[in-house]
UniProtKB/Swiss-Prot annotation:
Family according to the record: Belongs to the INSYN2 family.
Comp. bias regions, Pro residues: 503-513
Gene: INSYN2B
Coiled coil stretches, renumbered: 411-448
Pfam families documented for this protein: FAM196 (PF15265)
Highest taxon in the source lineage: Eukaryota
Compositionally biased tracts (Basic and acidic residues): 235-254
Ranges for region Disordered: 24-52, 215-388, 492-529
Biased composition (Polar residues): 255-269, 292-308, 329-365, 374-388
Biased composition (Low complexity): 309-323
Keywords tagged on the record: Coiled coil
Protein name per its UniProtKB record: Protein INSYN2B
Amino acid sequence: MAQQNMKVRPVLLKRNSLESVEFVKQPHHRRSKSQQVRFKEDGTTKNPTGLAEVDVQTPEDPAVMGKTQATRHHLPPTYSLSFPRSQKAGGFRNIAIQTSPSLRKHFPVFKRKRLTASKSLVEMPTASQSAIQVNGNLSEQDIVSSDLAYLRLAQHLEDGPRRVKVSHAFLPRVPKVQSNGPVSICLEAGTWRSLEKATAAIQVPDDIYHSPSWEARESALSPDRSAEVSNSIHPLDDTRPGDGRRVTPLDSEKSTSCLNATSVASHTPGTEELKPELLLPKDNSDDKDLGSLSSQSKETCVPSSPRTHSSPSQGSHSQPAHPGRASDCPSSSNNHQNLVSLKTNSASKSAPGCQEQTANNPTESDTLEFPNCPGSNHLPSSLSRSETKLQSNREISDINQIHLARGELCDLQGRLQSVEESLHSNQEKIKVLLNVIQDLEKARALTEGRNFYRTGQDLNNCSTCQNTACIIYSVEYDFRQQEGRFHEVLQSLEEAEPVEEASPPPKSPAEPPAPEKQDLRRKTKKVKKKCFWWI
């Protein structure tokens, strides 16, 4: 299969490429062989330069050719189905055919039972490197036979998405080959030279839209070239059967920013650690070349990205989260949801240039719309999942606050209980002390030959003495007596000041203490029933 792919997958390249001479005989040699799947051999025989040489160099533009020569060793190719008309001036024809590398994604059975078909279709982007070099040498019959061969390949995987019918006035032909892969029908818009240089990397299947290795391949479209493509091809009407995304005529700047956001998305620190499991079987070594190239493409695309208004941080925010999930994609049946969640993560964290692809502005005609995208069906669910996660986190924080409030309440209750216990213990101590004082007062009254306390209560018939409340009266008496002495001192001091001025006779300190005691006894008799009622 991989050898047949060499003729199935011609990609955009000029006919008279200098490096393509050594690859001229290989596609014919591979076409004569039986259909076999050799991934490691194909991956090892093709050097990274073969991968990078997909970037077309037009001799008409030496400046751009020099720039592409400087960068072609860094850029892995981007593959998309574009069938432009033959350039009459140049006299050569550029045709690119691609299958969706994520065909196995919806059906995990392909990994084991139908490995030949899936691997061959997955292998196509890297297997056709030498066919890329001799694109100009392929005749029309070879192209038609390659289309028919790809039809046979596509019929093995007829479970995949099939919506590939584009009717446009400018379209030369849209073969039914593209039942699985992305289709970009690049219309003639005056400058095919820029179209050649940009290897029609505008279209990537939405299923693998943010997979690291596919983005590594898409990064072959440098921002400068993508700017030229988007500026020169306004009537770009492309459908992606892989994801059902329909691109209406793009505004050049916004399409460039969105496209470059996907190509720049692979230029992150995680690019060196691309997961080949996402696109190819685990034993495939072709993506190692792609990984190295994409790690190099990070150097070339990122500096020129300000021209096309695509920030490298758009993909860099979302990319480190990709490899962890991407390794599970081929083996699990719910890998589509993982990729969709990856897409939503990258879209939610990207700048406004690529946020326009998601549900922020789904109705604008100049942004990418994907109403029929299989991933778009899961976008609201994944967004709602993130919202529910945020809500659950908030609920957890609220519960924690409630727990804290409950803990504080328990602390307050404990403190209140301790205060109540201390009050109770102090009350008991007070009672004990009052009983002791009562006994002392009673003993003193008996020693003095009195039948009453100093406050005037009877020792035997005092009703308050039974509740140990009368003792406070004696204490109060002592306090009042001390207070009277204190007031006497204060009055003496206050009168000493006017004495210096008018020297009036001080009469208040000379009052006899006997009436004071009688008044205190009267007050205590009146108040004795109110004191210590709480005991």
